[in-house]
Amino acid sequence: MASSSADNLTDKNIVFRKLKSKSENKVCFDCSAKNPTWASVTYGIFLCIDCSATHRNLGVHISFVRSTNLDSWSPEQLRTMMFGGNNRAQVFFKQHGWTDGGKIEAKYTSRAADLYRQILAKEVAKAIAEETNSGLLSSPVATSQLPEVSNGVSSYSVKEELPLSKHEATSATSSPKASNTVVPSTFKKPIGAKRTGKTGGLGARKLTTKPKDNLYEQKPEEVAPVIPAVSSTNNGESKSSAGSSFASRFEYNDDLQSGGQSVGGTQVLNHVAPPKSSSFFSDFGMDSSFPKKSSSNSSKSQVEESDEARKKFTNAKSISSAQYFGDQNKNADLESKATLQKFAGSASISSADFYGHDQDDSNIDITASDLINRLSFQAQQDLSSLVNIAGETKKKLGTLASGIFSDIQDRML
């Protein structure tokens, strides 16, 4: 019987069938339209679809609207509708000065609406708490599965342990968590339950059976020996490894001797080798490309001083370079004079003729100009051909369009 009544409270079809059987719930609370299919969970009232849209615009913090046919309802929401109803809400709002007419927004944002919402919420919470407590007290499962408590310790019967073999003992020690875990009871202590048994004491019980001796003969698990790395004391292995491969240039080795020799006598490079030469470019193989200067050339050459020029130009007011250096530029003057005499009877002289350059550049210039002319002529021909093609295409498209339009007109007529 209790289960059937609980199902009736959680089944929305049964709840709404009972609520809509009342005459005041057969019309909309705000506009009195017949057969409302929506409801405001916040106030427990029935609404039509138009008024439900207005409530939805107010926001869910003011009015939470749901469909009585399409939406799903929780038990708390159904209880709110059962505690509410159009008749109770109408009486409450009239007592606080609100009639059926008026603006919906002002009505549901007023102090009266807030007070009515709080009253419904308190009644629903109180009913749910009472049903929860009564369900725990009347539940046969909760009372039958609670263990008997004596002096704060549950009186679970201590079973006599069977003798274990060595194999079972080792398996039990390998999984102590599985054997020692106790599942706590999830049931709460019923209200008004009395403690049974004697009071006082810590609840310790004396063992009636003697523990088996084979439990103390269990051997602890042997830890697998860790395989050590290559020992530094093994001279034979270190010699073979040193002789088989050289150490890395950036590897740190503790067994290297101070002279750079390994144990096997093999030459091993140090961590950072000193440079073989002081030159920076010698490490990259670039030292050979630069000729080395002698020590005599590296120092500045000493200019031999003489008193010849000083004695020669003591009383001179000005000195020219030709007078100072003598006949060093006479050969150049003779060559230029000979070149000018070569073109004495010519009307014009080019730079190529004067300096003796080849005349192949003129042929190159002529070829380039000819190439430019040919390219421009070819471009003009291509442009004219493109213009002709565009004109022909335009004519073809025009004839095709006129044919299509004429065909469409013939079909329409």
Swiss-Prot record:
Residues 234-244, 289-301 have a biased composition (Low complexity). Keywords: Acetylation, GTPase activation, Metal-binding, Phosphoprotein, Zinc, Zinc-finger. Gene3D superfamilies: Arf GTPase activating protein (1.10.220.150). PROSITE patterns: ARFGAP. Residues 158-244, 289-312 are annotated as: Disordered. Residues 13-131 form the Arf-GAP domain. The modification Phosphoserine is found at S318. Residues 170-184 have a biased composition (Polar residues). GO terms for molecular function: GTPase activator activity; zinc ion binding. SMART domains: ArfGap. The modification N-acetylalanine is found at A2. A zinc finger (C4-type) spans 28-51. Residues 158-169, 210-222 have a biased composition (Basic and acidic residues). It holds the Pfam family ArfGap. GTPase-activating protein (GAP) for ADP ribosylation factor (ARF). This is Probable ADP-ribosylation factor GTPase-activating protein AGD8. It comes from Arabidopsis thaliana.
